[in-house]
Amino acid sequence: MPADHHPLRSVLETVGPESCPGQFNFHCHTLCSDGSLEPLALIRQASSRGLTQLAVTDHHSSASFQPMQDWLKQQRDLGETVPILWSGMEISAILRGCLVHVLALGFEPAHKSLAVYNQGDAAVGEALRAESVCQAIHDAGGLAILAHPGRYRVGFADLIDAAAELGFDGGEAWYDYDMQTRWSWSPVVCEAIDRRLKNLGLLRTCGTDSHGLDLEGR
């Protein structure tokens, strides 16, 4: 599926500073990588808090996706209102000589192009290059998103520009760089990142990057 026609695109086009953590969360973790919650505990919490759309983005693992999808189907069959879950994974990559993280969203979890990234550890060699990561995500039918652009040793403007040149679909605009107990996006830096992404015609996402027991905290 071409990224321009991806069904998640229309959702991400509505993301704003107030979308996270109550409505959307496209960046969080479970015990399948370095998070603290079991996958089913996370999806139950997301459902009980009224989230409408989310993706769990464990590092180099999509193992949490199917168990959560199975639980959501059970709940829908019982007539419950539950969130829409998109496949997700956080992948390490080298961009402009800097180690960055790329969020893969809405891809086919078993696709062969992502096998090298879906084994629990970062890839090596050519597969670690950002262009290789982006192409693999697209080959698997997903969207490639630059995670937390303001967290790296290279400035966010250079990284966003480089990502755009490589065909990335977007960047994580709304993020808590102060890592507060309760998630809140960081003024100034998030607004600047959002403007740059918007000016380049890129999608903007949001997420708590939760690794703990509370989806609304870091």
Report residues per predicted region.
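Active-site beta-loop-alpha junctions enriched in small/polar residues
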Residues: 29-31, 59, 88-94, 107, ...
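Short acidic/histidine-rich active-site segments
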Residues: 201-217
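Active-site neighborhood of phospho(di)ester-bond hydrolases with catalytic His/Asp-centered motifs
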Residues: 24-26, 54-59, 86-89, 145-148, ...
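Charged helix-capping and loop-helix junction motifs
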Residues: 41, 156-162, 185-192
